[in-house]
Amino acid sequence: IRLTSHDFTTYIHSVNVGIFATGLAKALLATDSSHDMRELAVGFFLHDIGKCATPLNVLNKPGPLDDEEWNVMRRHPFEGFQLLEKLNAATKESRVIVMEHHERHDGKGYPRRLKGDQIHIYSKICCIADVFDALTSVRPYKESKTPFQALQIMKDQMRSEFDPVFFERFVLLFSEGSYSK
């Protein structure tokens, strides 16, 4: 995949999000056999594939993005969706994850400003994992937070952005011994 050679940090982030999101999906959906966890994991791992079209000077900018750079960055979900459609790659659900992983429960996300039940459940799962990994990873523009600090920030400052049931279950993944199950 081009993402590996385009930006290794984004590649590592995609792997981390894939792991966290798959863990959350298994915790939420394990009793429902209609969900194909392997195909679902593909969508989680590919969620940022559209960033292979994002210039490195935007991805790795050491300071805040200006309005034009944010507009470029906000295109990556749509560009990833289009790439997978063009290649007829991944399932429809995986492509939806790629398109919707920056949508927020409160309607303040992008690219389509969906809210609540308008957002696919798989995208809601990916959103939580994506934010958690972004907070716990070193980036050119910020230091990393500990997992506890990240969960605290998500709870105190961002809670309205996440499906409340899914977020509570994500927090429980970090209770003693539960993440290894």
Residue ranges and their predicted role:
Residues 1-181:
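Histidine- and acidic-residue-rich, metal-dependent catalytic cores
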